[in-house]
Amino acid sequence: MQSVERAAVVVHSRKDVSVALGRVRAVAERSGVELLFDGEGGNPDIAIVLGGDGTMLRGLARFLENGVPVLGVNFGRVGFLTAIKGDEVEAGLARVFDGEYRIVELPTLELELDGQRHVAVNDTVVTSAELGRLIELQYAIGGEDLGVQPCDGLICATPQGSTAYNLSNGGPVLVWGLDALVVTFVAPHTLHARPLVVGRGVDIVVENRSPDVPAAVLIDGDPVANLALGEGATVRLAPEHSRLAILPEQTFFTRYGQVFGPGANGR
């Protein structure tokens, strides 16, 4: 990659990262890199995120439209999507600013709801809008009706989102590079509901079939709408791709072992 001239900076909104930010400024000054902060233009070559996976998610969504690659420095707990440890800021960013990074293209999700289009980086979830209430969801994949499933919800996750809520509910991890999404139920009340991996060009249609429980639709953890009885939403792979920047030697499997392997993060 070419060396970096301008870098946008995204920070965790509720954490004091002033010390880390000072370290980033020092590296940028030595490397001759201009830093851009919230509200500043300047067409950055890369975005540097100081935080964990939640802040990375916000950064990937923010720069999705203009195609700016996003690189994370981990100041969170898990940091699966981040490339540099918090105590390696100087060495890691010096390499990045010198052009030592590569880009992983990650698929996103498109959700159609009431004529509106939404894009998710991690996942979309349809769940009960009332805490503790079972919901009945009818779902179809690729135009094939697969019936009504009593459950707590349904997750559609991208490869990068497959290690989040999907993983916690027993769904498979999708390796970076797969152009696919995974459909996983949350606490299904059956022995037969299993996760399904779905490719590009296939629609997932989900409808609320509970007469007395509204369904909530969430995109990357944020609620966007409720579905009454008979109302539904459609999810598919979107044309847009997130651009995740990592160090050249890093791979999905090295990150997977470091973050989710035995003994990682206190597990």
Question: For the regions a protein language model found, what residue spans apply to each?
Answer:
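ATP/nucleoside-binding phosphotransfer catalytic cores, i.e., glycine-rich phosphate-binding loops
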Residues: 118, 126, 131, 142-145, ...
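Glycine-rich phosphate/dinucleotide-binding loop and adjoining beta-alpha-beta core of small-molecule
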Residues: 49-50, 55-78, 82-85
